[in-house]
From Swiss-Prot:
Transmembrane segments: none
Complex formation: Component of the Mediator complex.
Family: Belongs to the Mediator complex subunit 6 family.
GO molecular function, one term: transcription coactivator activity
Record keywords: Activator, Nucleus, Transcription, Transcription regulation
Comp. bias regions, Low complexity: 190-205, 316-325
Cell compartments where the protein resides: Nucleus
Provenance organism: Neurospora crassa (strain ATCC 24698 / 74-OR23-1A / CBS 708.71 / DSM 1257 / FGSC 987)
GO cellular component, one term: mediator complex
Statement: the UniProt record of this protein carries the keyword RNA-binding: no
Name of the featured protein: Mediator of RNA polymerase II transcription subunit 6
Region (Disordered): 186-238, 316-360
Pfam families: Med6
Amino acid sequence: MAFDPAANAGPPLDEIQWHTPPQFEAGIHSNSILYYFAQSPFYDKTSNNEVVFQQGLNNQAMSQYLATRELFESRLKEMSGLEFIVAQEPAETGPGMGTGVWVINKQTRRKRPPTNPARPEDGPPDEIIVHSVYFVVGENIYMAPTLADVLSSRIGAIATAITKTIPLVDEVSDWAPAVGRRYITPAQPSAGAGAASGTTNYTASRTATPLPDGLPSTATTNKPGAKAGGGTTTNDPLLDSLLMEEALLTHERYGTEYMDENPITGKPGDFHLTSTGRKTQTKSALTLKEAAAALPALNTKGLGAAGSNPLAKGAAAAAAANANAVTGKETKSPKTPGGGGPPKPKRRKSKNVITTPGAA
């Protein structure tokens, strides 16, 4: 059977914790941290670290680079390629005390051509590409997760929590045409007799829904232990059917009536606008129509002559009034014989004699 690397690769590197008893003097310190990391599965033997290590073991002139970490890393910085280098040392929290956390970067170094060949040290800095980060805590080595892995894990946890809450919300909510939205209070295990009786607690919606006449309100039917007719109220399919029928009848009868921004009180068929005091004129309009239909018809047959037709007399009087208004003449009312007082005597005009003084 052929060897399958994918099947024998084991768990992902960012999900394992590796440690081994250190085989160095004084344990893990600045000069032995890279050698200790080289024993872990995170290490890559094709890196420049392995090249410098093998050269120091087999070449006497290169063995000096294995003495300290500073010399070892200085040799790595002169080369191009993949390398493991200490990015952060343990922070000092006190005299001779550190956190014990080492940060190691797996990176690729690329050399840039110097601008002045005579002084290559003054050239541009090397190009560094970091592939992964590892941290050593005590004797344990971990691989730091990437930002994409952290976000994916958090989003997955949030989605799982939301998926679990949706069925719970569906279980505690209930809706009926007459009473609206209701929420069931989950029964507590230590509720005692209330939980043992099997009654269900409901929390009604904030907006009260008007109920048909003869039906109990939501405040009394939804409370545990509330009695209607001498017993505890429960969900009744027959009552639900009756409420549904009442709702449909109310909609068919008063479905054309709408509510506006003004607060409306009353019941279907008799709404009142509380802000202005106005009322719907539906009933008054119907009353006027019925009164107009109940008036008797006026019989005008046989009233052809003006003397016997009161309507003709009225028309003649109106025509005479209009004629007087046009000509400016007024019609004098006839004198009633014997109805007035004695006739006034006529006033005679006196003639005044004007005398002219004669000449002296």
